[in-house]
UniProtKB/Swiss-Prot annotation:
Pfam families: Ribosomal_L23
Gene name per UniProt: rplW
NCBIfam families the UniProt entry points to: PRK05738.2-4
Family note: Belongs to the universal ribosomal protein uL23 family.
PROSITE patterns documented for this protein: RIBOSOMAL_L23
Protein name (record): Large ribosomal subunit protein uL23
GO molecular function: rRNA binding; structural constituent of ribosome
Protein function: One of the early assembly proteins it binds 23S rRNA. One of the proteins that surrounds the polypeptide exit tunnel on the outside of the ribosome. Forms the main docking site for trigger factor binding to the ribosome.
Assembly: Part of the 50S ribosomal subunit. Contacts protein L29, and trigger factor when it is bound to the ribosome.
Keywords, alphabetical: Ribonucleoprotein, Ribosomal protein, RNA-binding, rRNA-binding
Superkingdom to which the source organism belongs: Bacteria
One annotated GO biological process: translation
GO cellular component, as recorded: ribonucleoprotein complex; ribosome
Length: 94
């Protein structure tokens, strides 16, 4: 997988906005990507140094439309912590 395939989109919520003060950035990533691949992708795309990566897996929710039921897509989020001497990611600046 290429770096652009691994990182899908940034996750911008109240909690992720608070974590940005600690140089922690949240991304939705490919479900098949591991921590090492996420780290390499962030370093390649944004030109920063990554200290640590935490990964969260979410199961799909059961949804029903009339009598038909199914599941939404499963998701995977990564919280990436940058090193102290690394520059910030401009993508998240508002």
């Amino acid at each position: 997988m290429e770096a652009r395939d691994i990182l899908k989109r940034p996750v911008i919520t109240e909690r992720s906005s608070e974590l940005m003060a600690e140089k922690k950035y949240t991304f939705e990533v490919d479900t098949r990507a591991n921590k090492t691949q996420v780290k390499d992708a962030v370093e390649e795309i944004f030109g920063v140094k990554v200290e640590k990566v935490n990964v969260l897996n979410y199961k799909g929710k059961f949804k029903r439309v009339g009598r038909y039921g199914g599941y939404t897509n499963k998701r995977r989020k990564a919280i990436v912590k940058l090193t102290a001497d690394s520059k910030e990611i401009e993508l998240f600046e508002m």
